[in-house]
Swiss-Prot record:
Belongs to the heme-copper respiratory oxidase family. It holds the Pfam family COX1. Component of the cytochrome c oxidase (complex IV, CIV), a multisubunit enzyme composed of a catalytic core of 3 subunits and several supernumerary subunits. The complex exists as a monomer or a dimer and forms supercomplexes (SCs) in the inner mitochondrial membrane with ubiquinol-cytochrome c oxidoreductase (cytochrome b-c1 complex, complex III, CIII). One of its GO terms (cellular component) is mitochondrial inner membrane. GO terms for biological process: electron transport coupled proton transport; mitochondrial electron transport, cytochrome c to oxygen. This is Cytochrome c oxidase subunit 1. Its EC number is 7.1.1.9. Cu cation binds at residues 242, 291-292. The chain crosses the membrane at residues 17-37, 58-78, 104-124, 147-167, 184-204, 236-256, 268-288, 311-331, 339-359, 373-393, 413-433, 453-473. Binds 2 heme A groups non-covalently per subunit. Binds a copper B center. Keywords: Calcium, Copper, Electron transport, Heme, Iron, Magnesium, Membrane, Metal-binding, Mitochondrion, Mitochondrion inner membrane, Respiratory chain, Translocase, Transmembrane, Transmembrane helix, Transport. InterPro entries: Cyt_c_oxase-like_su1_dom, Cyt_c_oxase-like_su1_sf, Cyt_C_Oxase_1, Cyt_c_Oxase_su1_BS, Cyt_c_oxase_su1_dom. The lineage of its organism: Eukaryota, Fungi, Dikarya, Ascomycota, Saccharomycotina.
């Protein structure tokens, strides 16, 4: 029975639950790796890795790949996408139900490959970008890097199949009257993410496949001795790598839009503009990849183009930030836990974006490249963008998904812990970068000791917060119905939120701009067997 339900499942909701469990599992491993990294860097000299500098780089690779491919993408796209997208457009399931199943079940073998690569010979200590010649056969002669490449292949296939599924579902399975202009913002976010995945992943797969050939079959795509060029790999990788960071954050944009709207009791300001802004970000994201490569010897005109085109991305991003602020302005704001995360997201994502504008300048980036300033920048965007929106989405939708409620007070404590912890980790990294501390090193001169120690303290705070989050999930599953009594986050309210064209909204006690809260909680195995009508 269990095997039939969970192994052979073709039901989007069950597959989404599997994605969530997988994401939390991977996230715990990835966070543990980051804690080990920070403990090693807490003071100058060797702390806990006994001078094994290869192992340090292996931890960096493991942390990066786990957090990106095995936590954020399965969580935001696979989990929330599979569960909420059909509900938000009034579909009974995803378009290709069995394809959905294989999309998930390609991920555990990928995780096995990645973990196995850390158990073989000298492991893969290449940095998450897997640049040759360090990832070539001379520098890494063991099969570890090959296993890592297989893991990337499997996650890529998984994401591609999922992307095809999302696009087909939102194209074919919208309910009566749900035109594109009436689709909720989260659905738009998932569609735009799926298009980006579809266009960028094949390029990554091509790049790592060439690397595989270089390593095992004596080709010389990236081998200077045979007429190849490592810079080609960097172009292929970053043509995927830059859209990838938008793939990680755009579903978060969608979630934050829903939360800001619901807890301000207002429709999102400029909804169509928000869609255009997301689409512009996605389009421009494909035109800026070489800003990761200012120091490889691009000529001045190329650098000028990539500087200016990167700065242009700040415009649609600014439109989104100010539209969210306009949504909050004059709203009847309720500071439930999801709303706290959304407001923190706005503040911290903006800071991350501002440091990004500094890095966009080719002249400045020559100094900042490969320093901790870059680490601080992208962790502000990912840790306090993507991860905060994961938490926000969990606290917003999990009572609806599970029919069980979390402990509001514990959730507030967890929010403040991770808010403080994440800032204490990543703010000092900017200072270290300005002082010139390089990335991917396990040891450093004494001058950098102070801020590194502060950063490591923040890491411990954040890990405590994550442990508390795991406990909150446990408590939600055990005491979920008791918690319902004093939970403020749930989307119940007595007064009408805002005038709806749809009478069901107007008469229902549950207020949100989208239809998922009109269903039972938890929703039936197949919701919308009778099609809903969007007036």
């Amino acid at each position: 029975m269990y095997i039939q339900r969970w192994l052979y499942s073709t039901n989007a909701k069950d597959i989404a639950i599997l994605y969530f469990i997988f994401a939390i599992f991977s996230g715990v491993i990835g966070s543990t790796m980051s804690l080990i990294i920070r403990l090693e860097l807490a003071a100058p000299g060797n702390q806990i890795l006994h001078g094994n500098h290869q192992l340090f780089n292996v931890l960096v690779v493991g942390h990066a790949l786990l957090m990106i491919f095995f936590l954020v993408m399965p969580g935001l796209v696979g989990g929330f996408g599979n569960y909420m997208l059909p509900l938000l457009i009034g579909a009974s399931d995803m378009s290709f139900a069995r394809l959905n199943n294989i999309s998930f079940w390609l991920l555990p073998p990928a995780l096995v490959c990645l973990v196995a690569s850390t158990l073989i010979e000298s492991w893969a200590g290449t940095g998450w970008t897997i640049y040759p010649p360090l990832s070539g056969i001379q520098a890494h002669s063991s099969p570890s890097v090959d296993l890592g490449i297989f893991a990337i292949h499997l996650t890529s296939i998984s994401s591609l199949l999922g992307a095809i599924n999302f696009i087909a579902t939102s194209y074919n399975m919208r309910t009566n009257g749900m035109s594109y202009s009436k689709m909720p913002l989260f659905v738009w976010a998932i569609i735009i993410t799926a298009v980006m995945l579809l266009l960028s992943l094949p390029v990554l797969t091509a790049g790592v496949t060439m690397l595989l050939m270089d390593r095992n079959f004596n080709t010389s795509f990236f081998e200077v001795a045979g007429g190849g060029d490592p810079v080609l790999y960097q172009h292929l990788f970053w043509f995927f790598g830059h859209p990838e960071v938008y793939i990680l954050i755009v579903p978060g944009f969608g979630i934050i839009s829903h939360i800001v709207s619901t807890y301000s009791k207002k429709p999102v300001f400029g909804e169509i503009s928000m869609v255009y802004a997301m689409a512009s970000i996605a389009f421009l994201g494909f035109l800026v990849w070489s800003h990761h490569m200012y120091i490889v010897g691009l000529d001045a005109d190329t650098r000028a183009y990539f500087t200016s085109s990167t700065m242009v991305i700040a415009v649609p991003t600014g439109i989104k930030i100010f539209s969210w602020l306009a949504t909050l302005y004059g709203g009847s704001i309720r500071l439930a836990v999801p709303m706290l995360y959304a407001i923190a997201f706005l503040f911290l994502f903006t800071i991350g974006g501002l440091t990004g504008v500094a890095l966009a300048n080719a002249s400045l980036d020559v100094a900042f490249h490969d320093t901790y300033y870059v680490v601080g920048h992208f962790h502000y965007v990912l840790s306090m963008g993507a991860i905060f929106s994961l938490f926000a989405g969990y606290y917003y939708w999990s009572p609806q998904i599970l029919g069980l409620y979390f402990n509001e007070r514990l959730a507030q404590i967890q929010f403040w812990l991770i808010f403080v912890g994440a800032n204490v980790i990543f703010m000092p990294m900017h200072f270290l970068g300005l002082q010139g501390m390089p990335r991917r090193i396990p040891d450093y001169p004494d001058a950098y000791a102070g801020w590194n120690y502060v950063s490591s303290i923040g890491s411990v705070i954040a890990i405590i917060s994550l442990a508390l989050f795991i406990y909150i999930i446990y408590d939600q599953l055990i005491n979920g119905l008791t918690n319902k009594i004093d939970n403020k986050s749930v989307v119940y309210s007595k007064a009408p939120d805002f005038v709806e064209s749809n009478t069901i909204f107007a008469n229902n006690s549950i207020k949100s701009a989208s239809i998922e809260f009109l269903l039972n909680s938890p929703p039936a195995i197949h919701s919308f067997n009778t099609p809903a009508v969007q007036s």
